[in-house]
């Protein structure tokens, strides 16, 4: 079973930029989208992995995705410190604006624990 990465951000251009950063560090992204519904559809076809998600997507908030996220997937929320302070403990976080190194380290750590 291999772990996958799905990126869901309201601006598809931002999601593609993050995909490029991850690719440069040897991480493969399975899907890039701007809505919770598309992210969950992609996740349903994967074995396990990490959903990198923004606070508010085009069709719902991150908590809606979290409520429907299968147990074999974990969420990484990219948000402001105010939002992070309110996030459940089950959600990993990276504060925006983010440093690429913080993103890479967090994703690698999450994937390691899923393996």
What do these predicted ranges mean?
Residues 4-5:
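Conserved hydrophobic helix-helix packing surfaces used for dimerization/oligomerization
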Residues 8-9:
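Conserved acidic carboxylate
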Residues 12-31:
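Two-component/phosphorelay signaling modules centered on CheY-like receiver
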Residues 15, 36, 49-71, 80-81:
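Conserved phosphotransfer microenvironments
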Residues 27-45, 60:
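A short, well-structured beta->alpha microelement
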Residues 43, 82-91:
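Short loop/helix-cap segments at secondary-structure boundaries that form the rim of catalytic
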Residues 98-111:
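C-terminal output helix
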